[in-house]
């Protein structure tokens, strides 16, 4: 059996290490991999976002299964492209990947189906967004780029000047490129933050161990958000009682909502949660095995 893991970071190395322990003893490949992965798998010089290149290699090499670990190739439709060639892959298809690929979509989905999240507004015009900020009197305020931004597209703004600067940076200066064509401006939630990865086949949701993700760049919960500075698990605030509430009010309803929208989600679904005084609320969804 031949298995290809798409990606080139520590997460992909961890996945390959576990696959290496399989009694099936698969031949392992990574695209593009890295120097460390090269000791455990054959690395091929194909970028994780090169959908055509990955598919071509998988066909030529006779790959039996592909694990698409990063979010970018999922949003680009790599799972769909592999399926067209009859190659099964782990991860959501392009239609489902919009759950992370567009924060506007995910926020509207939660609102439509009653999944608890922060109050918000969406904007496609920088002037309208700036006017909304000037009318706001409650800070901090959170400004989010609509599309993928390597975990850096969420800006917590302490005052009007910072919020206006965030709108300008994202929508006018295009700090995150096309991902900033639209933004979400939402209320700032308080409480312990919880990260929960889960496996789903589009019907059943099986959560993994909870974790606490440290996103800020500096000590003392200061600095800009990053893709992640570290994680501890399990999360001490995520009790069995809270886990049950999240399952019934967030996890199951999210999967059901995606089915209702004709976008069944299959793969790994990450729930970024805040345990607010009003109960657990969704901060964000992610597609990938980000805390492996």
Task: Label the predicted regions.
Residues 1-95:
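ATP-binding N-terminal substructure of ATP-dependent carboxylate-amine bond-forming enzymes
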Residues 5, 30-31, 67-68, 89-92, ...:
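General beta-strand structural signal in soluble alpha/beta enzymes
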Residues 38-41, 55, 98-104, 218-220:
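Short, charged, surface-exposed secondary-structure boundary motifs
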Residues 44-49, 121-124, 157:
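Short acidic-hydrophobic, aromatic-tinged amphipathic segments that line or gate anion-handling sites
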Residues 66, 290-292:
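Conserved small/polar residues in nucleotide/adenosyl-binding loops
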Residues 90-153:
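A conserved helix-loop-beta module that forms one wall/lid of the active-site cleft
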Residues 154-289:
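Internal nucleotide-binding/catalytic subdomain
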């Amino acid at each position: 059996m031949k298995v290809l893991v798409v990606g080139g970071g520590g997460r992909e190395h961890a996945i390959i290490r576990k696959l290496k322990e399989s009694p099936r003893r698969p031949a392992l490949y990574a695209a593009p991999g890295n120097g460390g992965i090269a000791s455990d798998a054959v690395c091929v010089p194909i970028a994780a976002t090169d959908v055509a290149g990955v598919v071509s290699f998988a066909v030529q090499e006779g790959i039996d299964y592909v694990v698409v670990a990063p979010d970018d190739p999922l949003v680009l439709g790599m799972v769909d492209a592999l399926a067209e060639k009859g190659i099964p892959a782990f991860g959501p298809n392009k239609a489902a990947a919009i759950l992370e690929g567009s924060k506007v979509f995910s926020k509207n989905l939660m609102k439509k189906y009653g999944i608890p999240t922060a109050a918000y507004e969406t904007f496609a015009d920088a002037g309208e967004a700036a006017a909304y900020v000037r009318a706001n009197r409650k800070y901090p305020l959170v400004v989010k780029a609509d599309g993928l931004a390597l975990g850096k597209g969420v800006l917590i703004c302490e005052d009007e000047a910072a919020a206006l600067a965030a709108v300008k940076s994202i929508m006018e200066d295009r700090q995150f490129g096309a991902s900033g064509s639209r933004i979400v401006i939402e209320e700032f939630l308080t409480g312990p933050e919880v990260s929960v990865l889960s496996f789903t086949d589009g019907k059943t949701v099986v959560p993994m161990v909870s974790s606490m993700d440290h996103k800020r760049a500096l000590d003392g919960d200061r600095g800009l958000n990053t893709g992640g500075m570290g994680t501890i698990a399990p999360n001490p605030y995520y009790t069995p009682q809270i886990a049950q509430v999240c399952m019934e009010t967030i996890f199951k309803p999210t999967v059901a909502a995606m089915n209702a929208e004709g976008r069944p989600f299959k793969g790994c679904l990450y729930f970024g949660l805040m345990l607010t005084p009003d109960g657990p609320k969704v901060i964000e969804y992610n597609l990938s095995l980000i805390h492996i």
